[in-house]
A protein has these predicted regions:
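Seven-transmembrane-like multi-pass membrane architecture, highlighting hydrophobic TM helices
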Residues: 13-16, 20, 28-29, 34-36
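Ser/Thr/Pro/Gly-rich low-complexity linker/stalk segments immediately outside membranes or between
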Residues: 29-53
């Protein structure tokens, strides 16, 4: 009679091994699930890449046909490459530099509108005055407006479950770094008269910690920008909390004066028909 194999594994051991494997797979799955849900911010917008490509195509064909030769496929890839397979709390401006180069756009002098806590009002104005531009009216801002995105160093996929919150998790996340860099570039390129729409219904109309106060105002160049015209807008029927004579606006005036940029301010209830003073 032939010898039985010495390495035969008993059925009991096989069951134990199978059970152990299932437990290991379950643990890995749970750890991956916890990893994807570890951030406090909203996850990547569904169909992010398709939205970027679609918005780019719409902008270059319909909104600004002068940019029709822009390669939207390359832009989409550069956008994804900026954050895919990277630590979402360690994103740098260098990551976005290829995207910025592909989306270079010249804004005519005296057509730049900045805003702080008045996004909807600013966009209402540019929807009527199509020759004026907020950041979201440029190709770069138009594509990313209202979207969320992030990846992770351990995968080539986007994280649709959670992304870092700029305050609760980390400031150097994909979205925050993008908008800071885009805002810097937008202000840096401005020339002529620059307009800013501020919320006069808030107690702190000019907030030095806002994107306008911490990024845009300090990147306006006096050799190109002759004046900053501020519109302090109050809600219709509301009680004005700030006007052109308060300490908040005086601080803004002081900053522009130090930068040798002329400053004018006007307050109004609701949006004016024209921002020109």
């Amino acid at each position: 009679m032939a010898d039985e194999p010495c390495c035969r594994i008993s059925k009991k051991v096989q069951i134990c091994l199978a059970f152990g494997l299932l437990v290991a797979v379950a643990v890995v799955g749970v750890l991956m699930w916890l990893h994807l849900y570890k951030w406090n911010g909203q996850g990547t917008t569904e169909h992010f890449a398709d939205i970027i490509l679609g918005r780019c195509s719409n902008y270059t064909r319909i909104v600004q046909p002068a940019l029709r030769n822009v390669d939207c496929q390359k832009i989409q890839e550069a956008f994804k490459d900026a954050f895919i397979s990277k630590n979402p709390c360690n994103i740098t401006e260098e990551d976005y530099r290829p995207l910025m180069k592909l989306t270079t756009q010249t804004i005519p002098c005296s057509k730049t509108i900045l805003w702080s806590k008045t996004k909807e009002m600013a966009h209402q104005y540019t929807r009527v005055h199509r020759d004026m531009f907020t950041l979201e009216d440029t190709l770069l801002g138009y594509m990313a407006d209202g979207l969320m995105w992030c990846g992770d160093s351990g995968t080539s996929e986007m994280n649709y479950r959670s992304c870092p919150h700029w305050k609760k998790d980390c400031p150097n996340n994909p979205v925050s770094v993008f908008w800071k860099m885009a805002s810097h570039r937008f202000a840096d390129a401005a020339c002529g008269v620059v307009y800013v729409i501020l919320n006069g219904s808030l107690s702190n109309t000019f907030d030095e910690n806002s994107t306008f106060g911490s990024v845009e105002i300090i990147n306006l160049h006096p050799e190109k920008v002759q004046a900053l015209h501020a519109w302090v807008i109050h809600d219709v029927g509301g009680v004005p909390s700030d006007s052109c004579m308060t300490s908040s606006i005086n601080k803004l005036k002081s900053i522009t004066s130090q930068r040798k940029i002329a400053f004018r301010c006007q307050h109004n209830t609701g949006l004016p028909h024209s921002l020109r003073m």
